[in-house]
Amino acid sequence: MHTPAPSHHRSTTRRDAAASAPRKPLILVVEDHEFARQALGALLSAMDYDVIEAENGRDALAKVAKGARPDVILLDLMMPVMDGWEFMKRQRGDWRLCTIPTIVVTGVASHDPRCLEMPVVRFLRKPYTFEQLLAAIHAEVSAEVVTPASRQTA
């Protein structure tokens, strides 16, 4: 007489399949304006990105210290508590952050001399379109997939 396989076998197979599925890129949105931060989070989630939100640079550093490892950081410059400039200074000296591509979304001109010293990948000047933002994120996520070792050895 044939005995059917235990039912837990199917659930284990599903878990294994889920574990082997590609990981969604994780985007850290650092923006002090709650509406803008939540809107970006919702739009990026709808485009199949995982999102972590931080209201200022200090909050973003705390999330990384607790284990968050974003693939891309979207960073506003003008924020209270810790602005984007200070965040980038600390990013440059932190092994957990220094290789993460950073897209600055700001109204500040990108030709500011301080920008030359920072680990910024690109600037998106406000107002920008969601398509421009997605293209910038996609370019960084695609670069990470193609050359992951280059970011680890930097």
Q: Model-predicted segments: where are they?
A:
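Two-component/phosphorelay signaling modules centered on CheY-like receiver
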Residues: 34-52
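Conserved acidic carboxylate
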Residues: 31
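Receiver (REC) domain active-site loop signature in two-component systems and cognate sites
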Residues: 79
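Active-site residues of response regulator receiver
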Residues: 76
